[in-house]
Amino acid sequence: MIGAPLLVAAAALVDGDGRVLVQQRSAGPLAGLWELPGGKLEPGETPAAALVRELGEELGIDVETACLAPAAFASEALGDRHLILLLHVCRKWRGVPRALEASALRWVRPVELHALAMPAPDRPLIGLLEALI
């Protein structure tokens, strides 16, 4: 039996040149992999509220929930749980993103995401980002 789903919100921050921001994980079993910024929802938290919090913590930027457009989701078995990744697109924020928790940040075109080592749940979102941006 699979336990309760693990809800994770991710943001595709899109700059004026149509590039998406990815960050490189610095620790844990996924260290070195590139991923879209975001994180787990806390109890009672909406995906948009989680992203506002996570983007502030991880990148030092301010985002308003109205600037987060739900775009897609991906799901992946994760041990005895099921991870559901909720993707939002964001084109407007305040501040300059900085790697506060990640090893590095990189702006890439969606097609370039194919060449990056990314966690399995992020990979199905690449084609969608190519179509959207």
Go through the PLM ranges and name each one:
Residues 11, 105, 109:
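Residue-level signal for inorganic ion chemistry
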Residues 6, 15, 72-96, 106, ...:
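Active-site-adjacent beta-strand/loop module that shapes the phosphate/pyrophosphate-binding cleft
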Residues 1-20, 40, 73:
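Conserved N-terminal beta-strand and adjoining loop/helix that marks the start
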Residues 19-57:
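Conserved Nudix-box catalytic region and its N-terminal flanking loop in Nudix hydrolases
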Residues 62-72:
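A short coil-to-beta-strand element that immediately follows conserved catalytic motifs
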Residues 97-102, 117-119:
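Short, charged, solvent-exposed linker or helix-capping segments at domain edges/interfaces
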